Amino acid sequence: MPLARNMPKNSSPLEKINTGNVKKLSLAWSFSTGVTEGHQAPPIVNNGYMYVTTPNAQVIALNAVTGEELWRYKKEIPADLLMLHNTNRGVALYGDKVYVGTVDSHLIALDAKTGKVVWDATVGDVKALSYITLAPLAAKGKILVGSSGGETGVRGYVAAFDANTGKEAWRTYTTAAPGEPGGDTWPAGDAYKNGGGSIWITGTYDPASNIAYWGTGNPAPWPTEGRPGDNLYTTSTIALDVDTGKIKGHHQYHYNDAWDWDEVSAPVLIDTNINGRKVKGAVHAGRNGYLWMLDRQPSGKLDFVNGISYVYNDVITSLDKTTGRPSYDMSKKPGMGKAVSFCPSLWGGKDWPPEAWNPKTKL
C-alpha cells in the first residue's frame, strides 16, 4: 500500500478482507511485549517485518507472518525521566532505517534489519522538560519530530533532521517571537518562551505540495491572565515547507485557549467538491467540538470553508462566516479564582486519535 498516497486520508484501498469474510478471521499468533502499561503505538509492517514500540522506549521487530521476535532495541532512560510521560506512539520507516523518538528528547535511527543504532540525535533539552511521545514523520529525505510538554512550560516546535546523517536541518517554533509574524498575539516580555503549543501527534505530509501539516497544542500556562492575545500558533493547524520549515499558512481553531483544548490531530487531506467548487480540503475534528473544513491553497495558505459542531458546545456561540474565528460565551471561560463548568470538557469532543476518510463512499 503506497503510504504517501493513503496516509493523508487514513484509508486503505485493500479489499481482500471485507464485510462478507471478516467473520472467518482467526488468531494466527500473539505476542507479549513484556510491558503491562498502556501501548499507544500501532504496529507498522514493511517487507515482512512488523515494528512495535512500547511505553519504556523499546522498539521490537517481529516476523509479521510468524510473530517471532527478530530484534529488540531499548534505550536506557532514568526512571525520573520516564515519569514525565512514559508514552511512545510509534516509529517512522524510511529507506533501510527505523526512526523513533524518546522521552529523553532524542531521535534515533536504527537499522531496519538488525536494530543496530545508526545515529542518535539530541532534539530538545530534557532538563527544560521537553520530551518526545509522537511517531516521527518521514518526508523528502528528512525526519520530522515535535516537542511534547505543553503542561511543563516548553516552547513547542517541529524540528527536521537529515534521514541519513541525523544532522538538524531546521527548527520551527509554534509560539511566535516579537518581530515574527504572529508575535503581536503575545504580550510583551517572555511569555512566548514558555507558551506551549506542543506537538505530540504526528503531522500529515502532502508530497504534491511538499507541505507538512501539523496540529498544535494548547498555550501555556492554562490561566490566560498572563498571556492576553490570540497566542499564535497554538491550537492551530500549521502548514510547513518541508525544505525550509517556513510556516506557509495556518488556521487557529480557537484563540487564547483556557480549556486545554489541544488541536494536535493532523488534518485528513481530501479532494472534494463543495457547492460545485473544487476544494483541496484539510479536515480536522477539533478537540473544541467542531468539525472543520479548510481549503489548502498551492501557496500553503489555509482558507476557512466551514465548521460544524459535532458535540454539544456551550463555549463557542458562533463562527465568523469568512474567517471561522469563534465568538465565546465569556461566562464559560475559566480564570484565576474563577471556577466554571463548560462543555465539551478538557478532554474535548475528540482527543488525539485520528480521523479517516473513505474516497469511495465519501464518508
Which residue ranges define each predicted feature?
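Extracytoplasmic beta-rich repeat domains
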Residues: 31-44, 72-92, 120-135, 152, ...
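Blade/loop signatures of beta-propeller domains
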Residues: 1-27, 174-181, 326-330
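Short coil/turn segments that connect the beta-strands within blades of beta-propeller domains
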Residues: 47-49, 95-96, 140-142, 208-210, ...
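Beta-propeller blade signature
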Residues: 110, 114-115, 156-167, 230-246, ...
